[in-house]
Amino acid sequence: MSGEIVVGSKYHPLALVSAAPQRACERGGDRGSGPKRSEACKTTTTFALSQLPPGTWTLGTIDWHTRSQPNRTPKLSGRINVPVHRGSILRNDNDDDDDRSSTVRVWLKRDSGHYWPSICQYMPAGATSMHYCVETRQLFVGLDNGSINEFILEQDYNRMTAMRDYLAHQARVTGIIFAADFEWVLSIGRDKLFQLHSSETGQKLGSYQTDAWYTALQFDAQSKHAFVGDYSGQIAMLKLDNSGVTFITTLKAHTGSIHTLAWDSEKQLLFSGSFDQSIIVWDIGGRQGTAYELQGHHNKVTALCYASVERLLLSGGEDGVIVCWNMAANRKETAAWIESDVCQACGRPFFWNIKAMMDQRQLGLRQHHCRYCGRALCARCTSQRIPIPAMGFEFEVRVCDQCHIQLKSENQSSLASFHDAKHSVIGMDLDAPRRRLLTIGQDRIIKIWDVSALFQ
């Protein structure tokens, strides 16, 4: 047996963590153009078909060779074809998933390089979220019925023992974090509740309710703050202690539901990925309300992983693309959009400015904005397109003529690289020290990537 573990479940697995698909839909091929996009020109596939209980599951490896950027392309080192919603890396060459029969499975990597299920734990309901603590081997599984089951995995990962059940929620559990330093279990659910429990006693310590489903959860152990994203696109910042939960503030910027959060404990940066196809970087530590926008996906952003030492952010989305963002680069805050009744360049009125339309005897125009300066302009005055990597715009965006001249004279080299995941990503987990990335797709496949090239 070699040393890597992945744990998962029908809705949510654990050690290299990924998530189970809502439907099977293989989405191969190119996902659109972008700076530094890797073009797969040769694929070598090795498969070993194993006879497993009901159905045939495919275990194998795929090595990708690319014509462009050969030293900056992640290599697919493992693949498991099985119904999964979540998954994680346990740092032991094992993998956990759950299938349609409401089971949690631990997959061990054999000397042959193939993954084999060593544990198949049947659950009273479908598993929808999961958290695994490597140091204590504690596994917390959130269920579709709102409860949380706690397990202990044996050292050989061939057995898991049930320890405690938490009656935490009245609807599906959508996120769990175990804070080992404080022995806290943080959870969120579709009942619009954030719950804080003690793993030592099993007692509830506090809760907080909002007006929308909670969909994403992150925790900063240093400051004891929890960040909770919801279906309306807002992020609540909560202060936790043994006496309960205190609301601090709300972060508002996204126009779509929050699906994933990541945290940089050193720089105190919060990363949020949304259904509005954008990523926002919130400078929590700076306390100035600064937020940077990252635009590199053509569909919903569903997963974020951050490597603090290398200062790299990995994002995955339903467009089937993994984007590697250089967060060590100097970035500029997104310009605020100015509102005006007339074009701030040529003075022609917009269509709601009836008085100016009558005075100038012309039809009103539609309002647009320059993405660099934020001025309100008409279409004719914002006809130029250019990428602005320093502001997070990796694709061409609308700018005014004046800003276009300025930007063309500056270096606009891309600050991100784009890689085809070959499936629509719904979950990711990163083991940065070992340079391993796990992705789970809507095609019900777990993929384990060697991302050493991205960290060079």
Segments (PLM) and residue ranges:
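Canonical WD40 repeat/beta-propeller blade segments in eukaryotic WD-repeat proteins
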Residues: H12-L16, S68, R79, P83-I89, ...
